[in-house]
From Swiss-Prot:
It is found in: Cytoplasm. Belongs to the DNA polymerase type-C family. DnaE subfamily. One of its GO terms (molecular function) is DNA-directed DNA polymerase activity. PANTHER family: DNA POLYMERASE III SUBUNIT ALPHA. This is DNA polymerase III subunit alpha. DNA polymerase III is a complex, multichain enzyme responsible for most of the replicative synthesis in bacteria. This DNA polymerase also exhibits 3' to 5' exonuclease activity. The alpha chain is the DNA polymerase. It comes from Streptococcus pyogenes serotype M1. Its EC number is 2.7.7.7. The gene is dnaE. It catalyses: DNA(n) + a 2'-deoxyribonucleoside 5'-triphosphate = DNA(n+1) + diphosphate. InterPro entries: DNA_pol3_alpha_NTPase_dom, DNA_pol3_alpha_thumb_dom, DNA_pol3_finger, DnaE2/DnaE/PolC, DNAPol_HHH, NA-bd_OB-fold, NA-bd_OB_tRNA, PHP_dom. DNA polymerase III contains a core (composed of alpha, epsilon and theta chains) that associates with a tau subunit. This core dimerizes to form the PolIII' complex. PolIII' associates with the gamma complex (composed of gamma, delta, delta', psi and chi chains) and with the beta chain to form the complete DNA polymerase III complex.
């Protein structure tokens, strides 16, 4: 019977449409018993192909297509792994090929268990190679020209399922080669997956011996994977068990904990670790963290359930004492649930590459590798790649892809988005392109590297998996699942920027204050830091900077570190429903049900609410006599909602509880309660470790706010300026002679850096810093290299006021810039002037300057216009920070954003405003009646007095606005001769609604009128429209 060997899969990137799952399905439909894959150079899909075949009752045949140079000729070879030995040889051959190291000698040394096929298209009778081979023939091969001494074998290339797929593959080739469809060669026909019986009949008729050769070749093929654990040996000169025991004992003695119950707990953990064969694993993790600390890196407090291990604490893998804080080792590791311990290593993100190099050098480049991932055609990428080849312009592509949501597939967005569907259906070619995009959506596009994963092995990795070359170290061809399934140690090196922040803060405190802070010794009950959490002042604090967490902190107002840990756990779906109960019970306003005195100590810290997975385990242990290992199995069954397992566990729980003298009714009720909480209960060990890191960050914010904001602004991409301003920091005006490159904070002043100026070349910024001081605008421009004498680079420097120290009129410098550049370039020539003749002009307003600064660097650096308005104001108003709930107040603010909605009942419009008074933000609501009155006045960025009632919602003050009044003092003045054109002027003004009051002065009768019903948005277009009817317009 025919077997399909030469099938290219989607892992021959953009050269096939054969995905594995559909391949199995179609192969069975077409009557195949044996199928193969033969991707070019790589084995990315090999493991999943073999396992998938076995699951689907198909015989897998693993192949590999390579080209190899021999006697100055590239020879195309198809290789077939005939058995497990051949499979391992392919791993090595593919690795050599994907590393650029494959040569004929190496190839010939690795042919045991491999059959070689040379396709008839690449064969000639002049070809002489140092190995035996078959000649692969298809339906179109002229058999009369074949070497009669060589064995023939049926070999048919498959790249798609049906002829209809040829157009899609043509598109993939165009995308791959970055060509238009017209420039891309047509796809070969007859490469679809054909019916097995038809092909068998064809070869039986035309080439029966070849068919027999194929049957003989594949008949005994079978692959066996070695799934045994292959941990590297940490130290071949000493027993890992003894070394781990020595190190942990020394670690506890160093911490002053060589006493009970620590000694018993340590022995218990060491026995389990040794029995499960993980001694080397702990030593490897210890070694990696030791390396980081030897470099002075802050490695954090640990993460996940590993924080429940005393061995990990003794080795300084974690920074949490699990005995003191009642954390469970069995949640991490127990003999009743055999699985690899999972210690993810957090490290400062800026040093991750150094850890990779250490692993490579310490354990060997053949024994360690990063892990591959596959980037796929997402819906937006598929649309963009395909529609581009249909000639769709960029602006149309952008508009179309904007309609695709983050979680959308092409099918779902087409179904739910009317506008998307209308675009697709508007043209025939769009419908065709969309069909192709849907066909390739989800297919691999290229390889990438796992963000965290590293694999290590005791022997060469290529004995188990294929590799390819990478920048810092080798990269696996198998994904993380396949790597672990082959018994290899996968570890996650997680670059955590918060560790970088903490380390940099520690270093800056030492530099600026001469104070050496031991981060791990920070008191987790520090009153000042606890107060910061209680206020919800946690912008920039790991795990607590989102609005949901901030609001939760304001409600809970944690009074001790344990309540911060609880807040982490309550800030989750399900658990958050019990926040009110938690608070009321803590305040004595609600009865605490502890169910049974024997489990009261477990539930008391969380006021009778099961917040943590460990509580479920402890209750099972204390109430029903379960071992902690068995209790962990119960927890897992509950969290995974394994009904069959849970039913069995429930009966066991009830029987064991009754055996201990518990009432059956109480036991059943308790089990149901445990079952409910286990679904969303949090890992307490993880919550504790990450809350400790959050507390350490918050400690710096509470005690050294200038250091905190300096580091956050320079090492984080997020915006912390607003938060700093709310904490009474001020943005300082800088000059060309003082501006730093990165942001700097000194004495509550924020000095914005040159790095914030969009589009400013870094080299130019460095040149400015190296060349200063400058004496004048002319001096600066004279010394500026010609390549930087461009308005696109110079104008932003002028607009943000860097030359105010020489000439405070920014508009004047801008208007003279062209002349200045001519002047400085002619300076010294025969016809040059000795000094520049400036042309005067009116400067920007305070508001305009502030807006330009915001636009260019993201924040205003000069005096805020609102402060100017406040200083001149004759009206009484209250700062946002002094507002009191359930009171009437007037605030002077700037509108940041306006969100308009329609009410569900009447369908009328209302608005939500986000406003600020330069120090604090406030949410403002305008209900339909007020919004209808003031909607024409409201504009983002403008200044207003708002009067209203202060309410509290979600522990945040907000205003229900009753009155709106413009705060800006500028007006639009019109000078007209008489009343002749009043109607035309009124009509024009009405077409430019805004927030600026209008005053008309009539020259003939010296009459001045302030318009009460018209306010405008002043633009050049408005000025042009008015020109025929007025003598002059002035905005001041």
């Amino acid at each position: 019977m025919f077997a399909q060997l030469d099938t290219k899969t989607v892992y021959s990137f953009m050269d096939s449409l054969i995905d594995l799952n559909h391949y199995f399905e179609r192969a069975k439909q077409f009557g195949y018993h044996t199928i193969g894959i033969m991707d070019k150079d790589n084995l990315y899909g090999a493991y999943h192909f073999i396992k998938g075949c076995q699951k689907n009752g198909l015989q897998p045949v693993l192949g590999l297509e390579i080209e190899i140079l021999y006697q100055e000729r590239q020879v195309l070879l198809n290789l077939i792994a005939q058995n497990t030995q051949g499979y391992h040889q392919l791993l090595k051959i593919s690795t050599a090929k994907m590393s650029g190291k494959l040569h004929m000698d190496y190839f010939c040394q690795h042919l045991e268990g491999i059959a070689v096929i040379i396709p008839s298209k690449g064969w000639s009778d002049t070809l002489v190679v140092p190995f035996d081979y078959y000649i692969g023939v298809d339906q179109y091969t002229d058999l009369s020209h074949m070497d009669s001494k060589r064995q023939l074998i049926p070999l048919r290339t498959v790249r798609y399922f049906a002829q209809d797929d040829m157009e899609t593959l043509h598109m993939l080739h165009a995308i791959r080669d970055n060509l238009s469809l017209a420039e891309t060669p047509v796809v070969e026909s007859d490469q679809e997956l054909a019916d097995c019986q038809q092909l068998t009949a064809f070869y039986q008729t035309h080439c029966p011996q070849a068919l027999q050769n194929l049957e003989d070749l594949v008949s005994g093929i079978y692959y066996d994977f070695d799934t045994n654990l292959k941990l590297p040996h940490f130290n071949r000169d000493k027993s890992a068990k003894q070394e781990l025991q020595d190190l942990t004992e020394a670690g506890l003695k160093e911490k002053g904990l060589w006493k009970e119950p620590y000694q018993s707990r340590l022995l218990h953990e060491l026995v389990i670790i040794s029995d499960m064969g993980f001694d080397d694993y702990f030593l490897i993790v210890w070694d990696l963290l030791r390396f980081g600390r030897s470099k002075g890196y802050y490695m954090g407090m640990g993460r996940g359930s590993a924080a429940g291990s005393l061995v990990a604490y003794a080795l300084n893998i974690t920074g949490i004492d699990p005995v003191q804080h009642d954390l469970l080792f069995e949640r991490f590791l127990n003999k009743e649930r055999y699985s690899m311990p999972d210690i993810d290593i957090d490290l400062p993100d800026i040093y991750r590459s150094e850890f990779l190099r250490y692993v490579r050098n310490r354990y060997g480049s053949d024994h360690s590798a990063q892990i591959v991932t596959f980037s796929t055609f997402g819906p937006k990428q598929a649309i963009r790649d395909v529609f581009k080849r249909f000639g769709v312009p960029e602006y149309e592509l952008t508009n179309l892809t904007k309609k695709i949501g983050f979680k959308d597939s092409l099918a779902t967005v087409y179904e739910k988005s009317i506008s998307f569907r209308q675009v697709i259906n508007s043209r025939t070619e769009f419908q065709k392109a969309f069909a192709i995009a849907k066909r390739i959506e989800g297919n691999p596009r290229q390889t990438s590297i796992h963000a965290a994963g590293i694999v290590m092995s005791d022997d060469a990795l290529t004995n188990h998996i294929p590799l390819k070359s990478g920048d810092d170290m080798m990269i696996t061809q198998y994904d993380a699942h396949a790597v672990e399934a082959n018994g290899l140690l996968k570890m996650d090196f997680l670059g955590l920027r918060n560790l970088t922040f903490v380390q940099k803060m520690q270093e800056k405190v030492a530099k600026d204050y001469g104070c050496q802070i031991d981060i791990t010794a920070i008191d987790l009950e520090d009153p000042q830091t606890l107060a910061l959490f209680a206020k919800g002042d946690t912008k920039g604090i790991f795990q607590f900077e989102q609005n949901g967490a901030i609001n939760l902190l304001k409600r809970i107002k944690p009074q001790r570190f344990e309540e911060i840990v609880a807040t982490t756990s309550l800030n989750r779906p399900g658990a958050s429903d019990y926040t009110t109960n938690f608070i009321k019970r803590r305040e004595g306003q609600e009865k605490i049900d502890l169910i049974d005195p024997v489990i009261a100590p477990i539930l008391e810290p969380t006021y009778g609410i099961m917040l943590y997975q460990e509580q479920v385990m402890q209750i099972a242990q204390v109430y029903a006599g379960f071992t902690l290992g068995k209790a962990d199995l119960l927890r897992r069954a509950m969290s995974k909602k394994n009904l069959q397992e849970m039913q069995k566990m429930e009966e066991d729980f009830i029987a064991s509880a009754k055996h201990l003298g518990r009432a059956e009714e109480t036991a059943r009720g308790l089990f149901k309660r445990m079952e409910k909480f286990a679904g969303y209960g949090f890992n307490r060990s993880h919550a504790f470790a990450y809350s400790a890191l959050a507390f350490q960050l918050a400690y710096f914010k509470a005690h050294y706010p200038a250091v905190f904001y300096d580091i956050m602004m320079n090492y984080s991409s997020s915006d912390y300026i607003t938060d700093a301003l709310e904490s009474d920091f001020q943005v300082a005006q800088v000059t060309i002679n003082s501006i730093p490159y990165t942001d700097k904070i000194e004495a509550s002043k924020i000095y914005m850096g040159l790095k914030n100026i969009k589009g400013l070349p870094r080299d130019f910024a460095y040149w400015i810093i190296e060349q200063r001081p400058f004496n004048s605008v002319e001096d600066f421009l004279t010394r500026t290299p010609e390549k930087y004498q461009k308005k696109v680079f110079l104008e932003p420097l002028i607009k943000i006021g860097l030359f105010d120290c020489f000439e405070p009129n920014r508009k004047k410098i801008l208007d003279n810039l062209d002349g200045l550049l001519v002047f400085v370039n002619e300076l010294g020539s025969l016809f040059s002037d000795s000094s520049f003749s400036w042309v005067d002009t009116k400067d920007y307003s305070v508001t305009e300057k502030y807006s330009l600064e915001q636009e260019i660097v993201g924040v205003g650096m000069s005096k805020h216009p609102l402060i100017d308005i406040a200083e001149k104001s004759t009206q009484t108003f209250t700062p946002i920070s002094q507002l009191v709930k359930e009171s009437e107040a007037v605030v002077l603010i700037q509108i940041d954003s306006i969100r308009i909605i329609r009410t569900k009942t009447s369908g009328q419009q209302m608005a939500f405003l986000s406003v600020n008074d330069t120090k604090k933000k406030l949410d403002v609501t305008l209900f339909p009646q007020e919004y209808a009155i003031y909607k024409d006045q409201l504009k983002e960025g403008e200044f207003y007095y708002l009067k209203g009632r202060i309410k509290e919602r979600d522990h945040r003050l907000q205003m229900v606005c009753q009155q709106v009044q413009m705060a800006i003092s500028q007006k639009y003045w019109l000078l007209v001769e008489n009343h002749q054109f009043d109607s035309q002027i009124s009509e024009i003004l009405g077409a430019f609604p805004g927030t600026t009051p209008v005053v008309i002065h009539y020259q003939k009768n010296k009459e001045t009128i302030a318009l009460t019903k018209i306010q405008v948005h002043v633009t050049e277009n408005l000025k042009e429209k008015l020109r025929p009817f007025v003598l002059k317009t002035v905005f001041r």
